């Protein structure tokens, strides 16, 4: 996979809704966090498939994220831009990941594995574990083992 394609992919664990994009893919959620916009699920559902694909394929460079924030300022509420979030850090495995893995009887990624994940993969794992997040329900916690397997399958231990 080319580095430029990493920002717009849909993970295998998201396959249940990837055909019609009925839920926001992690790639879109990450870009929204990076540009400081909150898109409600109801608004996402009102978008056409082409509009959803446009957001999915939108670049994640600083310039592209600025353009995305401008484009969405009328339809999305503003939130703090993601800066120095745990998924942007590679110096330690976040405690939330450790807790969620232990609770779901999954092996905890070691530091080397965490460092080998790209930013979108780290973002997805943390969103799947985050309390109070729409992905932290039991069904999404069920996606945690799938995501871990998908992301860590070819990583050096």
Predicted regions: what they are:
Residues 126-157:
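Glycine-rich, aromatic-bearing surface loops/beta-hairpins
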Residues 40-47, 55-58, 110-130:
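A structural feature that tracks compact, well-ordered secondary-structure segments
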Residues 33, 73-122:
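Short, solvent-exposed interaction modules
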């Amino acid at each position: 996979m080319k580095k430029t394609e990493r920002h717009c992919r849909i993970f295998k664990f998201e396959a249940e809704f990837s055909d019609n994009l009925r839920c926001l893919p992690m790639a879109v959620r990450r870009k929204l966090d990076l540009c400081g916009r909150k898109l409600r699920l109801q608004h996402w559902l009102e978008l056409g498939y082409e509009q959803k694909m446009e957001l999915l394929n939108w670049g994640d460079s600083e310039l592209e994220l600025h353009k995305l924030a401008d484009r969405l300022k009328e339809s999305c509420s503003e939130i703090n831009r993601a800066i120095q979030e745990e998924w942007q850090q590679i110096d330690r495995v976040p405690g939330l990941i450790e807790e969620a893995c232990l609770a779901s009887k999954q092996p905890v990624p070691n530091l080397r594995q965490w460092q080998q994940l790209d930013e979108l993969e780290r973002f997805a794992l943390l969103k799947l574990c985050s309390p109070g997040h729409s992905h932290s329900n039991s069904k999404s916690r069920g996606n945690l083992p799938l995501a871990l397997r998908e992301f860590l399958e070819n990583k050096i231990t």
